[in-house]
Amino acid sequence: MRLHGLIAAALAAMAWTAAAQAEPATAKVVLHAPLRILDPVLTNAYITRNHGYLIYDTLFAIDTQGRPQPQMVDRWTVSDDKLSYTFTLRPGLKFHDGTAVTGEDVVASLARWEQRDPMGKRLAAATQTMDSPSADSFRIVLKQPFGLVLETLGKPGSPVPFIMPKRIAQTPATEAIKESIGSGPYRFDAKAFEAGVKAVYIKNPDYVPRQEPAAYFSGGKVPMFDRIEVINVPDAQTAVNALHQGEIDFVENVAPDLLPQLGQAKGVTVERYGENTDTYMLRMNWKQPPLDNPKIRQAVLAALNQTDYLDASLGDPKFYRLCGAMLSCISAYRSDVGATQTRPADLARARALLKEGGYKGEKIVVLHPTDVRSLSALAPVTAQALRSIGMTVDVQSMDWATLLSRRSKDAPV
Protein backbone atom coordinates (compact mmCIF):
# COMPACT_ATOMS: atom_id res chain seq x y z
CA MET A 1 0.00 0.00 0.00
CA ARG A 2 2.03 2.92 -1.23
CA LEU A 3 0.70 5.50 1.14
CA HIS A 4 4.13 6.99 1.34
CA GLY A 5 5.50 8.33 4.46
CA LEU A 6 4.57 7.56 7.83
CA ILE A 7 5.06 5.86 10.87
CA ALA A 8 6.75 3.08 9.94
CA ALA A 9 4.52 0.30 9.09
CA ALA A 10 6.91 -0.59 6.29
CA LEU A 11 5.81 -4.18 5.78
CA ALA A 12 7.50 -5.91 2.86
CA ALA A 13 5.21 -8.37 1.11
CA MET A 14 6.20 -10.89 -1.53
CA ALA A 15 3.81 -10.78 -4.47
CA TRP A 16 2.99 -13.61 -6.83
CA THR A 17 1.85 -13.99 -10.39
CA ALA A 18 0.21 -16.86 -12.19
CA ALA A 19 0.15 -17.25 -15.95
CA ALA A 20 -1.09 -19.95 -18.26
CA GLN A 21 1.76 -21.35 -20.37
CA ALA A 22 0.69 -20.05 -23.74
CA GLU A 23 1.38 -17.08 -26.00
CA PRO A 24 -1.85 -16.34 -27.87
CA ALA A 25 -2.21 -13.34 -30.15
CA THR A 26 -4.51 -11.91 -27.50
CA ALA A 27 -3.53 -11.89 -23.83
CA LYS A 28 -6.35 -11.62 -21.31
CA VAL A 29 -5.03 -10.48 -17.95
CA VAL A 30 -6.34 -9.69 -14.48
CA LEU A 31 -4.34 -7.03 -12.66
CA HIS A 32 -4.20 -5.96 -9.03
CA ALA A 33 -6.86 -3.24 -9.23
CA PRO A 34 -9.55 -1.99 -11.60
CA LEU A 35 -8.45 0.75 -14.00
CA ARG A 36 -10.63 3.83 -13.70
CA ILE A 37 -8.25 6.80 -13.98
CA LEU A 38 -6.39 7.07 -17.30
CA ASP A 39 -4.27 10.16 -16.68
CA PRO A 40 -0.87 8.96 -15.34
CA VAL A 41 0.01 12.47 -14.13
CA LEU A 42 -3.21 13.07 -12.23
CA THR A 43 -2.84 10.03 -9.93
CA ASN A 44 -0.02 8.01 -8.41
CA ALA A 45 -1.99 4.74 -8.57
CA TYR A 46 0.20 1.98 -9.93
CA ILE A 47 -2.64 0.53 -11.99
CA THR A 48 -2.68 3.82 -13.92
CA ARG A 49 1.11 3.91 -14.05
CA ASN A 50 1.16 0.41 -15.58
CA HIS A 51 -1.49 1.50 -18.08
CA GLY A 52 0.87 4.35 -18.93
CA TYR A 53 3.83 2.08 -19.56
CA LEU A 54 1.83 0.23 -22.22
CA ILE A 55 0.98 3.29 -24.28
CA TYR A 56 3.62 5.92 -23.45
CA ASP A 57 7.40 5.98 -23.53
CA THR A 58 9.93 7.69 -21.29
CA LEU A 59 13.08 9.68 -21.93
CA PHE A 60 15.18 7.50 -19.65
CA ALA A 61 14.51 4.29 -17.76
CA ILE A 62 16.07 2.54 -14.77
CA ASP A 63 18.00 -0.71 -15.29
CA THR A 64 18.43 -3.62 -12.88
CA GLN A 65 21.25 -1.78 -11.11
CA GLY A 66 19.13 1.32 -10.53
CA ARG A 67 21.02 3.31 -13.17
CA PRO A 68 19.24 5.57 -15.69
CA GLN A 69 19.57 4.43 -19.31
CA PRO A 70 18.37 6.30 -22.43
CA GLN A 71 14.97 5.27 -23.76
CA MET A 72 13.48 7.89 -26.10
CA VAL A 73 16.75 9.83 -25.90
CA ASP A 74 19.43 8.94 -28.45
CA ARG A 75 22.31 11.01 -27.04
CA TRP A 76 22.93 13.94 -24.73
CA THR A 77 25.62 16.36 -23.62
CA VAL A 78 26.28 18.07 -20.31
CA SER A 79 28.19 21.34 -19.97
CA ASP A 80 31.38 21.44 -17.92
CA ASP A 81 29.66 23.36 -15.14
CA LYS A 82 26.87 20.71 -15.03
CA LEU A 83 24.23 23.39 -15.57
CA SER A 84 23.19 22.76 -19.19
CA TYR A 85 21.81 19.45 -20.48
CA THR A 86 21.00 19.04 -24.18
CA PHE A 87 19.18 15.89 -25.32
CA THR A 88 18.62 14.56 -28.84
CA LEU A 89 15.69 12.21 -29.40
CA ARG A 90 15.89 8.90 -31.24
CA PRO A 91 15.02 9.27 -34.92
CA GLY A 92 11.64 8.08 -36.14
CA LEU A 93 9.66 8.38 -32.90
CA LYS A 94 5.93 8.68 -33.70
CA PHE A 95 2.82 9.15 -31.61
CA HIS A 96 -0.17 6.88 -32.14
CA ASP A 97 -1.93 9.65 -34.09
CA GLY A 98 0.86 9.54 -36.67
CA THR A 99 2.59 12.78 -35.68
CA ALA A 100 6.31 12.89 -34.97
CA VAL A 101 7.56 13.22 -31.40
CA THR A 102 9.32 16.56 -31.03
CA GLY A 103 11.27 18.43 -28.41
CA GLU A 104 8.25 20.69 -27.87
CA ASP A 105 6.16 17.65 -26.92
CA VAL A 106 8.81 16.72 -24.38
CA VAL A 107 8.96 20.21 -22.88
CA ALA A 108 5.17 20.41 -22.55
CA SER A 109 4.95 16.92 -21.03
CA LEU A 110 7.67 17.61 -18.47
CA ALA A 111 6.18 21.00 -17.58
CA ARG A 112 2.83 19.38 -16.74
CA TRP A 113 4.36 16.43 -14.91
CA GLU A 114 6.64 18.65 -12.80
CA GLN A 115 3.58 20.23 -11.20
CA ARG A 116 2.45 16.89 -9.74
CA ASP A 117 5.58 14.90 -8.97
CA PRO A 118 7.82 15.55 -5.91
CA MET A 119 11.06 14.92 -7.80
CA GLY A 120 9.73 16.89 -10.74
CA LYS A 121 9.08 19.84 -8.45
CA ARG A 122 12.66 19.66 -7.20
CA LEU A 123 13.99 19.61 -10.74
CA ALA A 124 11.73 22.53 -11.67
CA ALA A 125 12.98 24.52 -8.68
CA ALA A 126 16.56 24.05 -9.88
CA THR A 127 15.74 24.85 -13.53
CA GLN A 128 16.29 28.24 -15.13
CA THR A 129 14.90 27.39 -18.57
CA MET A 130 13.60 24.37 -20.46
CA ASP A 131 13.19 24.66 -24.22
CA SER A 132 13.44 22.88 -27.57
CA PRO A 133 16.35 24.20 -29.70
CA SER A 134 15.29 22.00 -32.65
CA ALA A 135 12.51 19.61 -33.60
CA ASP A 136 14.42 16.58 -32.35
CA SER A 137 15.97 18.02 -29.18
CA PHE A 138 15.23 19.62 -25.85
CA ARG A 139 17.40 21.43 -23.34
CA ILE A 140 17.35 21.95 -19.59
CA VAL A 141 19.43 24.83 -18.21
CA LEU A 142 19.82 24.81 -14.44
CA LYS A 143 20.27 27.81 -12.19
CA GLN A 144 21.95 25.61 -9.62
CA PRO A 145 23.48 22.12 -9.73
CA PHE A 146 21.03 19.22 -9.55
CA GLY A 147 22.74 15.85 -9.50
CA LEU A 148 19.70 13.70 -10.28
CA VAL A 149 18.59 15.04 -13.65
CA LEU A 150 18.75 11.70 -15.49
CA GLU A 151 17.41 9.75 -12.52
CA THR A 152 14.44 12.11 -12.29
CA LEU A 153 13.65 11.87 -16.01
CA GLY A 154 13.79 8.07 -15.74
CA LYS A 155 12.02 7.53 -12.42
CA PRO A 156 9.65 4.52 -12.47
CA GLY A 157 7.58 5.59 -9.46
CA SER A 158 4.28 7.38 -9.96
CA PRO A 159 3.78 9.84 -11.47
CA VAL A 160 6.17 8.76 -14.25
CA PRO A 161 7.34 11.47 -16.70
CA PHE A 162 5.62 9.94 -19.72
CA ILE A 163 5.78 11.87 -22.98
CA MET A 164 2.56 12.78 -24.78
CA PRO A 165 1.69 15.20 -27.61
CA LYS A 166 2.01 18.87 -26.73
CA ARG A 167 -1.68 19.54 -27.43
CA ILE A 168 -2.60 16.97 -24.76
CA ALA A 169 0.19 17.88 -22.35
CA GLN A 170 -1.07 21.47 -22.29
CA THR A 171 -4.08 20.24 -20.28
CA PRO A 172 -3.87 21.86 -16.82
CA ALA A 173 -2.22 19.52 -14.32
CA THR A 174 -5.35 19.72 -12.16
CA GLU A 175 -7.58 18.39 -14.95
CA ALA A 176 -7.70 14.93 -16.54
CA ILE A 177 -6.49 14.52 -20.11
CA LYS A 178 -9.23 13.61 -22.58
CA GLU A 179 -7.09 11.52 -24.95
CA SER A 180 -4.66 8.70 -24.17
CA ILE A 181 -2.11 8.98 -26.97
CA GLY A 182 1.54 8.11 -26.57
CA SER A 183 4.39 6.67 -28.61
CA GLY A 184 4.73 3.39 -26.71
CA PRO A 185 4.45 -0.25 -27.80
CA TYR A 186 0.65 -0.40 -27.54
CA ARG A 187 -2.21 1.86 -28.57
CA PHE A 188 -5.10 2.38 -26.19
CA ASP A 189 -8.51 1.44 -27.61
CA ALA A 190 -10.62 4.24 -26.14
CA LYS A 191 -13.85 2.92 -27.67
CA ALA A 192 -13.46 -0.44 -25.92
CA PHE A 193 -12.69 1.07 -22.51
CA GLU A 194 -15.16 0.43 -19.69
CA ALA A 195 -13.97 2.15 -16.51
CA GLY A 196 -13.32 -0.39 -13.79
CA VAL A 197 -14.32 -3.26 -16.08
CA LYS A 198 -12.16 -3.59 -19.19
CA ALA A 199 -9.29 -1.91 -21.03
CA VAL A 200 -7.94 -2.96 -24.44
CA TYR A 201 -4.51 -2.29 -25.95
CA ILE A 202 -3.54 -2.89 -29.58
CA LYS A 203 0.05 -3.50 -30.73
CA ASN A 204 1.59 -0.36 -32.22
CA PRO A 205 3.01 -1.28 -35.65
CA ASP A 206 5.10 1.90 -35.75
CA TYR A 207 6.92 1.25 -32.48
CA VAL A 208 10.65 0.58 -32.84
CA PRO A 209 12.17 -0.93 -29.66
CA ARG A 210 15.67 -0.05 -28.60
CA GLN A 211 18.32 -2.59 -29.59
CA GLU A 212 19.55 -3.19 -26.03
CA PRO A 213 18.04 -6.20 -24.23
CA ALA A 214 15.30 -5.45 -21.74
CA ALA A 215 16.58 -4.79 -18.22
CA TYR A 216 13.98 -3.81 -15.61
CA PHE A 217 12.38 -0.64 -17.05
CA SER A 218 15.14 -0.05 -19.61
CA GLY A 219 16.10 -1.62 -22.92
CA GLY A 220 14.02 -2.85 -25.82
CA LYS A 221 10.28 -3.07 -25.13
CA VAL A 222 9.16 -5.76 -27.55
CA PRO A 223 5.37 -6.24 -27.80
CA MET A 224 4.66 -9.96 -27.37
CA PHE A 225 0.96 -9.85 -28.20
CA ASP A 226 -1.18 -8.28 -30.89
CA ARG A 227 -3.83 -7.39 -28.34
CA ILE A 228 -3.99 -7.15 -24.55
CA GLU A 229 -7.29 -7.17 -22.70
CA VAL A 230 -7.18 -6.10 -19.06
CA ILE A 231 -10.25 -7.50 -17.34
CA ASN A 232 -11.41 -6.75 -13.81
CA VAL A 233 -12.38 -9.87 -11.86
CA PRO A 234 -13.08 -8.74 -8.26
CA ASP A 235 -13.34 -12.22 -6.76
CA ALA A 236 -10.00 -14.02 -6.33
CA GLN A 237 -11.49 -17.52 -6.64
CA THR A 238 -13.32 -16.56 -9.82
CA ALA A 239 -10.05 -15.32 -11.33
CA VAL A 240 -8.29 -18.58 -10.48
CA ASN A 241 -11.15 -20.60 -11.93
CA ALA A 242 -10.98 -18.57 -15.13
CA LEU A 243 -7.24 -19.23 -15.34
CA HIS A 244 -7.85 -22.96 -14.89
CA GLN A 245 -10.42 -22.93 -17.67
CA GLY A 246 -8.26 -20.95 -20.09
CA GLU A 247 -10.59 -17.96 -20.10
CA ILE A 248 -7.75 -15.67 -18.97
CA ASP A 249 -3.98 -15.96 -19.33
CA PHE A 250 -2.48 -14.07 -16.42
CA VAL A 251 -3.33 -13.09 -12.84
CA GLU A 252 -1.07 -10.45 -11.31
CA ASN A 253 -1.86 -10.95 -7.62
CA VAL A 254 -2.85 -14.40 -6.43
CA ALA A 255 -4.38 -14.88 -3.00
CA PRO A 256 -1.93 -17.04 -0.99
CA ASP A 257 -4.65 -19.46 0.11
CA LEU A 258 -5.38 -20.22 -3.56
CA LEU A 259 -1.78 -21.05 -4.50
CA PRO A 260 -2.19 -24.81 -3.81
CA GLN A 261 -4.93 -24.94 -6.45
CA LEU A 262 -2.65 -23.35 -9.03
CA GLY A 263 0.35 -25.47 -8.08
CA GLN A 264 -1.58 -28.58 -9.11
CA ALA A 265 -2.96 -27.14 -12.34
CA LYS A 266 -1.59 -28.28 -15.68
CA GLY A 267 -0.30 -25.57 -17.97
CA VAL A 268 -0.12 -22.97 -15.22
CA THR A 269 3.10 -21.43 -13.91
CA VAL A 270 3.24 -19.66 -10.56
CA GLU A 271 6.12 -17.24 -10.06
CA ARG A 272 7.23 -14.72 -7.50
CA TYR A 273 8.13 -11.61 -9.47
CA GLY A 274 10.52 -9.91 -7.10
CA GLU A 275 12.20 -9.94 -3.73
CA ASN A 276 10.83 -6.57 -2.63
CA THR A 277 7.80 -6.06 -4.78
CA ASP A 278 5.40 -4.37 -2.36
CA THR A 279 5.80 -2.32 0.78
CA TYR A 280 2.76 -1.59 2.89
CA MET A 281 2.84 1.82 4.52
CA LEU A 282 0.36 3.48 6.84
CA ARG A 283 0.13 7.19 6.06
CA MET A 284 -1.45 9.69 8.45
CA ASN A 285 -2.82 13.11 7.61
CA TRP A 286 -0.38 14.96 9.82
CA LYS A 287 -1.67 18.35 8.67
CA GLN A 288 -4.90 18.01 10.63
CA PRO A 289 -5.57 17.48 14.34
CA PRO A 290 -5.19 15.30 16.25
CA LEU A 291 -2.59 13.63 14.01
CA ASP A 292 -0.65 16.87 13.67
CA ASN A 293 0.57 16.13 17.20
CA PRO A 294 3.76 13.97 17.19
CA LYS A 295 2.75 12.35 20.48
CA ILE A 296 -0.50 11.11 18.94
CA ARG A 297 1.37 9.71 15.94
CA GLN A 298 3.84 8.00 18.26
CA ALA A 299 0.90 6.50 20.12
CA VAL A 300 -0.44 5.05 16.88
CA LEU A 301 2.98 3.60 16.09
CA ALA A 302 3.19 1.96 19.49
CA ALA A 303 -0.21 0.33 18.95
CA LEU A 304 0.67 -1.32 15.65
CA ASN A 305 2.18 -4.71 14.94
CA GLN A 306 3.56 -5.49 11.48
CA THR A 307 2.78 -9.18 11.81
CA ASP A 308 -0.93 -8.47 12.31
CA TYR A 309 -1.08 -6.70 8.95
CA LEU A 310 0.92 -9.28 7.06
CA ASP A 311 -0.97 -12.22 8.52
CA ALA A 312 -4.27 -10.57 7.59
CA SER A 313 -3.14 -9.81 4.04
CA LEU A 314 -0.92 -12.77 3.18
CA GLY A 315 -1.45 -15.39 5.86
CA ASP A 316 1.69 -17.50 5.56
CA PRO A 317 4.99 -16.01 6.86
CA LYS A 318 6.84 -17.54 3.91
CA PHE A 319 5.22 -14.89 1.73
CA TYR A 320 6.51 -11.90 3.69
CA ARG A 321 9.25 -10.58 5.92
CA LEU A 322 9.38 -7.93 8.61
CA CYS A 323 11.34 -4.82 7.79
CA GLY A 324 11.85 -1.61 9.70
CA ALA A 325 13.64 0.38 7.01
CA MET A 326 11.93 3.56 5.87
CA LEU A 327 13.52 3.13 2.44
CA SER A 328 13.40 -0.06 0.40
CA CYS A 329 14.37 -3.09 2.44
CA ILE A 330 16.87 -4.22 -0.21
CA SER A 331 18.17 -0.73 -0.97
CA ALA A 332 21.76 0.31 -0.41
CA TYR A 333 20.24 3.08 1.72
CA ARG A 334 18.47 0.71 4.07
CA SER A 335 18.91 1.51 7.75
CA ASP A 336 17.33 -0.03 10.83
CA VAL A 337 18.21 2.98 12.98
CA GLY A 338 15.14 3.87 15.01
CA ALA A 339 13.20 0.96 13.53
CA THR A 340 10.84 0.46 16.47
CA GLN A 341 8.06 -0.60 14.14
CA THR A 342 9.20 -4.25 13.98
CA ARG A 343 8.70 -4.65 17.73
CA PRO A 344 5.47 -6.06 19.20
CA ALA A 345 2.72 -3.55 19.94
CA ASP A 346 2.97 -1.82 23.32
CA LEU A 347 -0.59 -0.83 24.18
CA ALA A 348 0.27 0.56 27.61
CA ARG A 349 2.85 2.89 26.09
CA ALA A 350 0.41 3.86 23.34
CA ARG A 351 -2.26 4.83 25.87
CA ALA A 352 0.30 6.82 27.87
CA LEU A 353 1.37 8.71 24.75
CA LEU A 354 -2.26 9.48 23.91
CA LYS A 355 -2.72 10.96 27.36
CA GLU A 356 0.52 12.90 27.11
CA GLY A 357 -0.57 14.25 23.71
CA GLY A 358 -3.90 15.44 25.09
CA TYR A 359 -6.11 13.21 22.94
CA LYS A 360 -9.76 14.06 23.60
CA GLY A 361 -11.57 11.40 21.61
CA GLU A 362 -11.39 13.11 18.23
CA LYS A 363 -12.59 10.95 15.34
CA ILE A 364 -9.94 9.22 13.24
CA VAL A 365 -11.07 8.27 9.73
CA VAL A 366 -9.49 5.13 8.25
CA LEU A 367 -9.87 4.79 4.48
CA HIS A 368 -10.70 1.24 3.41
CA PRO A 369 -10.25 0.16 -0.26
CA THR A 370 -12.71 -2.61 -1.02
CA ASP A 371 -11.70 -3.58 -4.55
CA VAL A 372 -7.97 -4.32 -4.13
CA ARG A 373 -7.60 -7.72 -2.51
CA SER A 374 -4.08 -7.21 -1.15
CA LEU A 375 -5.11 -3.97 0.59
CA SER A 376 -8.67 -4.62 1.71
CA ALA A 377 -7.59 -6.54 4.83
CA LEU A 378 -5.40 -3.74 6.18
CA ALA A 379 -7.90 -1.06 7.27
CA PRO A 380 -9.72 -3.38 9.73
CA VAL A 381 -6.38 -4.17 11.39
CA THR A 382 -5.65 -0.46 11.81
CA ALA A 383 -9.13 0.22 13.16
CA GLN A 384 -8.88 -2.56 15.74
CA ALA A 385 -5.45 -1.39 16.89
CA LEU A 386 -6.59 2.21 17.35
CA ARG A 387 -9.77 1.23 19.15
CA SER A 388 -7.76 -0.98 21.50
CA ILE A 389 -6.00 2.11 22.87
CA GLY A 390 -9.18 4.16 23.19
CA MET A 391 -9.27 6.10 19.94
CA THR A 392 -12.52 6.89 18.15
CA VAL A 393 -12.40 5.32 14.69
CA ASP A 394 -14.59 5.72 11.61
CA VAL A 395 -13.80 3.17 8.86
CA GLN A 396 -14.97 4.51 5.50
CA SER A 397 -15.12 1.93 2.70
CA MET A 398 -14.75 2.92 -0.95
CA ASP A 399 -13.21 1.75 -4.22
CA TRP A 400 -9.52 2.35 -4.87
CA ALA A 401 -10.00 5.20 -7.33
CA THR A 402 -12.19 7.09 -4.87
CA LEU A 403 -9.69 6.48 -2.09
CA LEU A 404 -6.86 7.91 -4.19
CA SER A 405 -8.87 11.05 -4.86
CA ARG A 406 -9.80 11.36 -1.20
CA ARG A 407 -6.24 10.70 -0.06
CA SER A 408 -4.87 13.56 -2.14
CA LYS A 409 -6.85 16.07 -0.10
CA ASP A 410 -5.51 17.23 3.26
CA ALA A 411 -8.70 18.96 4.41
CA PRO A 412 -10.42 17.83 7.62
CA VAL A 413 -12.63 14.76 7.18
Spans of model-derived segments:
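Gly/Pro-rich hinge or "lid" segments in bacterial periplasmic/extracellular proteins
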Residues: 67, 156-229, 237-238, 347-348, ...
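Periplasmic-binding protein-like
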Residues: 287, 291-331, 377-378
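Ligand/substrate-recognition segments at binding pockets and active sites
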Residues: 235-236, 320, 351-413
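Surface-exposed binding/hinge segments that line
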Residues: 21, 88, 122-194
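N-terminal lobe/hinge region of extracytoplasmic solute-binding protein
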Residues: 30-80, 111, 181
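Structural transition elements
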Residues: 186, 320-356, 372-377
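Aromatic- and charge-enriched surface segment that lines or borders ligand/interaction sites
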Residues: 74-119, 133, 138-141, 242, ...
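Ligand-site clamp/hinge motif
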Residues: 209-261, 384, 392
